UniProtKB/Swiss-Prot annotation:
Entry-linked InterPro entries: Rad52_fam, Rad52_Rad59_Rad22, Rad52_Rad59_Rad22_sf, Rad59
Pfam families named in the record: Rad52_Rad22
Subcellular location: Nucleus
Function: Involved in the repair of double-strand breaks in DNA during vegetative growth via recombination and single-strand annealing. Anneals complementary single-stranded DNA.
Protein name stated in the entry: DNA repair protein RAD59
Parts of the chain that traverse the membrane: none
Swiss-Prot/TrEMBL keywords: DNA damage, DNA recombination, DNA repair, Nucleus
Disulphide linkage map: none
GO CC terms: mitochondrial matrix; nucleus
Gene: RAD59
Length: 204
């Protein structure tokens, strides 16, 4: 069991159909799009605080207008915030898939000479995992126009992956909000985030 996870399944009863031997089954818990421990809830809160401080300055001076967060926060800034919130070894990301979805070629005349330009559209899917098992996935997009087809391919893939990573980090806010709503409504019945009503009874 992870040092950051305190989940118990001792009171859960499992049933199997004909021909199913329960002792041969291995219980696997999915922490996709939900916190695996109170550690991740706290750390995601710290990340969100940094994001809100950063965006407040941008929106306050109205330099960019009300664009989406993924447009106004550079990737390197979000990575820095993630390192500060989770620790350098507290999170990791992996590019699950990168696809080139469209390629267009056209000519532009400049100073009397025709220049070929390639517009490449790419899509990437990235998975981000915290050290306690909490994980999420997001899809990023990019469109790059360059005179070199190879350079356009490479940059489009890179920027699509960066966009997906940003969306992963920004999606944590919604994950925690949904989690807190479930805790408040006693959605969880066991483990660290079990029913608050049950917890209140135990504390009496």
């Amino acid at each position: 069991m992870s040092d950051y996870t305190n989940v118990s399944w001792d009171n859960v009863t499992y049933y199997g159909g004909n021909g199913v031997a329960l002792d041969e089954l291995e219980l696997k818990v999915s922490w996709h799009n939900r916190p695996a421990s109170s550690w991740s809830v706290r750390r995601i809160g710290a990340l969100q605080h940094k994001i809100e401080q950063y965006t407040f300055k941008i929106y306050h001076v109205n330099r960019y207008g009300k664009h989406s967060l993924s447009q106004v926060i550079p990737t390197h800034v979000l990575i820095q915030f993630a390192n500060e919130a989770f620790g350098y070894n507290g999170w990791s990301s992996a590019v699950e898939e990168v696809l080139i979805t469209d390629v267009k070629q056209r000519e532009r005349v400049r100073d009397g000479a025709a220049i070929e330009l390639y517009t490449v559209t790419a899509e990437a899917r990235v998975k981000l995992t915290l050290q306690d098992g909490t994980n999420t996935e997001a899809t990023g997009l990019s469109k790059i126009t360059l005179p070199s087809k190879g350079d356009a391919y490479g940059k489009a893939k890179k920027e699509a992956s960066a966009d997906a990573l940003k969306r992963c980090l920004l999606s944590f806010e919604g994950i925690v909000i949904e989690h807190e709503q479930k805790v408040a409504s006693n959605y969880y019945t066991d483990g660290e985030f079990g029913s608050r009503k049950a917890g209140d009874k135990r504390d009496r």
